[in-house]
A protein has these predicted regions:
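C-terminal structured domain segments
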Residues: 119, 123-142, 153
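Short, charged/polar micro-motifs that form catalytic or ligand-binding hotspots
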Residues: 47-54, 121-125, 151-152
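Short, solvent-exposed loop/turn segments at secondary-structure junctions
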Residues: 77-80, 118, 153-154
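Short glycine-/polar-rich loops that comprise or flank the Walker A/P-loop
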Residues: 69, 109, 141-144
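Basic, glycine-rich
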Residues: 137-171
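Solvent-exposed, charged helical/coil patches
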Residues: 1-73
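Active-site metal-binding core of divalent-cation-utilizing nuclease and nuclease-like domains
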Residues: 52, 65, 69-106
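Short beta-strand-loop-alpha-helix junction that forms the active-site gateway
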Residues: 97-130
């Protein structure tokens, strides 16, 4: 109903619920400390002028923007390292910075998106497995509220699959 009012009338009315545009604007205005990039980080900049770590992250960010999906780059999430261990009743928090923290405007559900871009590096793959385990221990599951994409030097990120993921989870 609110969306059907003229702009001058909208200024006189306070809607009971936020429109999608208002909700997205408020969601995007949340301030957070960005993870630092190294001084010699490659110069990959998104359409939103964000300095990202890889060409694949640039592609994901630009595809999210083109699809109208609000996202935060490397938004910090607080995780409990002892969440699943009954022998450690005390909290031991750490921060994970998913590559993208995305908002499905239709459902207003948030998704962490991890792009694992060097899966043919054994050390990287091992750290990725530990990170995914920590996500699961803190209630983030693939297909529920966690999106995972990955690539190796031989198998790059598929733009077709990426667009299907966006349509399935974020539209």
């Amino acid at each position: 109903m609110y969306e059907k009012l003229s702009a001058p009338r909208q200024q006189l009315v306070t809607p009971l619920t936020l429109t999608d545009e208002q909700y997205a604007d408020a969601w995007l205005k949340v301030e957070y400390r960005h993870k630092k990039l190294l001084d010699d980080a490659p110069p990959f900049f998104t359409e939103n002028n964000e300095h990202v770590r890889s060409k694949s992250e640039k592609i994901i960010a630009d595809t999210l923007k083109a699809a109208g999906v609000p996202y935060r780059y490397e938004f910090p999430l607080l995780m409990d390292k002892n969440a699943e261990d009954p022998d450690f009743p005390d909290y031991d928090f750490c921060r994970l910075h998913p590559d993208f923290y995305c908002l499905n405007l239709r459902t207003r559900q948030e998704f962490a998106w991890e792009h694992l871009g060097m899966m043919d590096d054994p050390d990287y793959a091992s750290r990725a497995a530990e990170k995914l385990q920590l996500y699961a221990e803190n209630g983030f599951f693939p297909g529920k509220n966690l999106i995972i994409t990955m690539e190796t030097t031989k198998k790059q990120l598929s733009s077709k699959i990426m667009k299907e993921i966006i349509t399935t989870y974020l539209k």
